[in-house]
Amino acid sequence: MEQEEPAVFGLGWLDQTQSIASNSANGLAMRMDRFFGVQRIDIEAAYSSLRLTTIQSWNDIDDFDTGVRLRGKVHLPRINERISLIFSEEDGDGTNYYTQNAASVSEQNTTRMNLEFDLTEQSRHRLFFRVGMRSNLKGRISARYRYEQDSDSRTNNRFTQSLYFKDGKGFGSFSRYQLDHVLANEGLVRWTNDVRFEETYTGAEYTSSLEYLQLRSNETAVSWYGRVNGVTSPGYVSSYDLGVRMRRNIYREWLYLELEPGYTWRKDAYALAREGTPYIFLRLEMAIGSYNR
């Protein structure tokens, strides 16, 4: 007799009911992204979810910093099955990798509330439209297209393109290409490239990162990463980063603890000298999901 799925559950329950091994890059990537709390995976899921994260960070340049994030998606089936309420820091698919994982909490974006309309849903193609309000009561709208391979191969390609308008700042675009490849021992190699243009920029922001992610068990995962962040005008690399994220599901299916030490070589402006500093993040996250019945 099959166990009935709970109406409300800790997101760790989803992984504990699945086997660790996967020969599919898409399947393993989904598990990794859900475990590490990557916003894309929750926003595109069939369930509602909320993640509340407290963040403590330190680096030798900015000293200690503290932050709180609320992210997630709440389906609104009584209004329309294709409409959801989104809590997000992101425009379209996301800010660049550097902003989401900067060595200072204060450099990360604050949470915004948006209504999202799922315009089309196919196995490979999805199109979303989002309208929301920023904390200063400025409006913002965006459209996001996502293409992803629909296959069981060990390699998976994903491309997303977002176009958006911010009241007071003008138009912008965000592009992301991501390549996942499954290795032995439940390991995943991920190469991610981001480019952002905005009317207020003289050029573009870009990020390229390489990660090796590994599930150690249903409760533990590790990610080693290196990334380069820069701007095109004036052309310079704003940071080189090396680090590791160690994340564990603790005590309850809805509670995660994460430690992220690393080292960054920063250049905060074109005319400034590059500085190197170690950094460390400590995150405690509550992650709860709900099926719509």
Residue ranges and their predicted role:
Residues 1-293:
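Transmembrane beta-barrel domains of bacterial outer-membrane proteins
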